Amino acid sequence: MENKVHMAAFSGMGAAPTPMAFPELFSALQQGVVDGQENPVTVITASKFWEVQKYVSLTGHVYSPAAVLASPVLLDGLTEEQRGWFAEAAKASAAATRAEVNRLEEAGVALLRENGMEVITDIDKAPFAALAEEASYSVYTDQYGGEMIERIKAVE
């Protein structure tokens, strides 16, 4: 997936991002066309990238939230009590999803190690986070303007 923010972040880290179709990635790693790839642990294990790469660094530079969404029409049709149930179910779903993602990642890291990959976890994540944040804002400043970016930054 070619994502402008990811491209800017990796360029800022000194890499030369090379977007390509995912089905081409394994052979590109195998042939040395690219030196690395960026994917969730579950994708790395499913693709058996341990066959074509030796290292994986768990930088935590991307967080992909999963939102629970509902239309105003649906929510407006619920009673106050039902909206409360909906909110409780959404929170429970979020907690269960996060727990499952963590479980899958832990199992995936173990599988990577079992298959000979060196998993690097002792990483100073602050520089990665700062570069990713800066890239996120810089990519969209021209499109939306500095004032909008500052309003977004102010949201907690």
Identify the role of each PLM range.
Residues 1-156:
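N-terminal secretory/targeting leader peptides
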